[in-house]
């Protein structure tokens, strides 16, 4: 039975609270998850659904953190399949990016659909050119997508047409998508409507989401693991992790794995009633 690990929002290289230690926390989470649930579970492949890096311009330390685990996976014979997120997507006027370079160097497979005047085209992965829009691994057909932002609803129509063209009943179809989804946010920004998402259902059996930094599932076929580490204090209280997914004759079983190295955050509160000066507060 095919088995894979679904991650998202690693944000390698993040510099939160100007703390070098917090930057390393994100590496330790990534490293521990890979050792426990990718190599330890002998998965067939790993999916990273966007925001592998925290920024387009990747610092040397972040690249070291990425390659350290990518090299372990490559040595174990476990392919890594990645899509761009809003943090690490390539610039429109520049055909180069660090994710594309890592793909060219053989550390990962970056999946990118082709958008032109005719709509969306999906190309099978070409191992010689190290590029493509979908790839077949262990009986699973994995489709990639771009970071569409607030236009994701409109982009989905053309993407669905392309998915229909490349559907194969012999393969288990998985789509990687980096987007917010309606009903999962605490802030009023445009998100992909669930009704629009449901239009994928005749072509896709598992949607591997990223972008929202908390775990959620929709109807047993849409999965968002959340970020591996908390990007701020508020996020610490969100449920998050990595999905270990097994595919069988009756579909798939996705289990959220949460036991791995993370920074513990303690929130403390103080009653300052009646303390009128900094000195009085300090004494209290």
Regions found by a protein language model. Name each.
Residues 1-69, 75:
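N-terminal active-site segment of His-dependent metallophosphoesterases
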Residues 1-24, 130-133, 246-247, 251-267:
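Domain-start "cap" segments at the beginnings of catalytic or binding domains
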Residues 7, 11-15, 47-54, 83, ...:
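Generic alpha-helix detector with strongest preference for long hydrophobic helices that associate
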Residues 31, 42, 61, 104, ...:
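Residue-identity detector for glutamine
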Residues 31-42, 161-164, 279-284:
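A short, well-ordered alpha-helical element
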Residues 45, 56-67, 71, 75-239, ...:
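His/Asp/Glu-rich metal-coordinating catalytic cores
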Residues 232-284:
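C-terminal functional module detector
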């Amino acid at each position: 039975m095919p088995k894979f690990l679904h991650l998202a929002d690693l944000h390698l290289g993040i510099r939160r609270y100007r703390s070098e230690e917090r930057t390393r926390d994100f590496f330790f989470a990534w490293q521990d998850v890979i050792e426990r649930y990718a190599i330890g579970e002998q998965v067939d492949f790993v999916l990273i659904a966007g925001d592998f890096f925290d920024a387009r311009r990747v610092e040397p330390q972040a690249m070291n953190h990425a390659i350290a685990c990518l090299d372990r996976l490559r040595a174990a014979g476990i392919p890594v399949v990645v899509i761009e997120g809003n943090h690490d997507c390539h610039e429109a006027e520049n055909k180069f990016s660090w994710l594309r370079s890592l793909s060219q160097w053989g550390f990962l497979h970056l999946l990118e659909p082709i958008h032109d005047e005719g709509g969306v085209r999906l190309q099978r992965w070409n191992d010689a050119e190290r590029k493509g829009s979908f790839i077949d691994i262990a009986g699973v057909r994995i489709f990639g997508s771009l970071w569409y932002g607030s236009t994701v609803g409109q982009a989905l129509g053309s993407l669905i047409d392309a998915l229909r063209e490349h559907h194969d009943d012999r393969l288990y179809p998985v789509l990687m998508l980096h987007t917010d989804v309606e009903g999962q946010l605490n802030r009023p920004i445009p998100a992909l409507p669930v009704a629009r998402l449901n239009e994928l259902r005749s072509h896709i059996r598992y949607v591997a989401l990223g972008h929202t930094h908390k775990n959620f599932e929709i109807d047993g076929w849409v999965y968002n693991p959340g970020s591996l580490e908390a990007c701020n204090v508020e996020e610490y209280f969100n449920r998050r992790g990595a999905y270990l997914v097994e595919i069988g004759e009756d579909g798939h079983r996705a289990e959220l794995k949460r036991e791995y190295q993370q920074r513990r955050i303690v929130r403390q509160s103080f009653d300052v009633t009646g303390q009128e000066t900094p000195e009085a507060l300090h004494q209290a």
